[in-house]
């Protein structure tokens, strides 16, 4: 795990999917929530564990903050709760009762962990203990690796300029008035089975998530 790695250890437990059918069932339940419009945002729990997923959900906007309560979780070890990398997903939803009904119907386990909080603060509570994390400072630490790699690719001056300003660019989307959000607008069909005759390659400039 990432947690074990920063402690210079390998670790003794490996994240695993113990029930493939349950995993598929959970995935399909999440897809249904997305399709029916109940999911506002989401993040997988993987490298770095739940704490990384929570922080990365906050990193996208300077106005975000979370108040999280883990008191309802059976696990008592806060380190395991925060850093375990077993498969899971965090979702921000808009109707707790309807989401709970859908997950209950699918037989998928879930917990309601918290709500939006004060901008720039991630507050975590577990069995009488409270943890207060400063999102902007942790965002800088999180982005620093990208900055150090960017220095090798773009040079010190440009990389430093980006590092100083990356969090000052608010997340905004601007669509043309004619944009409908539908594939059919561009002559695309998600159910197409015949080749289109168009060949394309997507080349990533910045590499991938294996930089650790």
Task: Describe each PLM feature range.
Residues 1-83, 97-199, 207:
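Intein/HINT protein-splicing elements and their conserved insertion hotspots or analogous self-processing inserts
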Residues 206-212:
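Short, intrinsically disordered, charge-balanced linker/junction segments flanking boundaries
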Residues 90-94:
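Short hydrophobic/aromatic beta-strand micro-patches
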């Amino acid at each position: 795990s990432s947690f074990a790695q920063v402690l210079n250890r390998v670790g003794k437990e490996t994240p695993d999917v113990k029930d493939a059918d349950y995993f598929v069932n959970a995935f399909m339940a999440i897809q249904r929530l997305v399709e029916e419009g109940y999911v506002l945002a989401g993040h997988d729990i993987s490298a770095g564990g739940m704490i990384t997923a929570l922080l990365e959900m906050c990193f996208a906007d300077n106005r975000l903050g979370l108040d999280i309560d883990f008191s309802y979780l059976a696990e008592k070890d806060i380190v395991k709760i925060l850093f375990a990398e077993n498969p899971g997903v965090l979702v921000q939803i808009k109707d707790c009762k309807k989401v709970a009904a859908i997950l209950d119907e699918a037989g998928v386990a879930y917990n309601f962990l918290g709500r939006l909080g004060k901008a720039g603060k991630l507050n975590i509570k577990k069995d009488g203990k409270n943890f207060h994390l400063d999102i902007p400072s942790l965002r800088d630490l999180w982005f620093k690796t990208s900055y150090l790699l960017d220095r090798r690719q773009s040079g010190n001056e440009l990389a430093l300029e980006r590092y100083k300003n990356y969090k000052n660019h608010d997340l905004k989307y601007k669509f043309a008035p004619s944009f409908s959000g539908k594939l059919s607008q561009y002559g695309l069909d998600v159910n197409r089975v015949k080749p289109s005759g168009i060949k394309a390659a997507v080349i990533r400039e910045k590499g991938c998530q294996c930089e650790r």
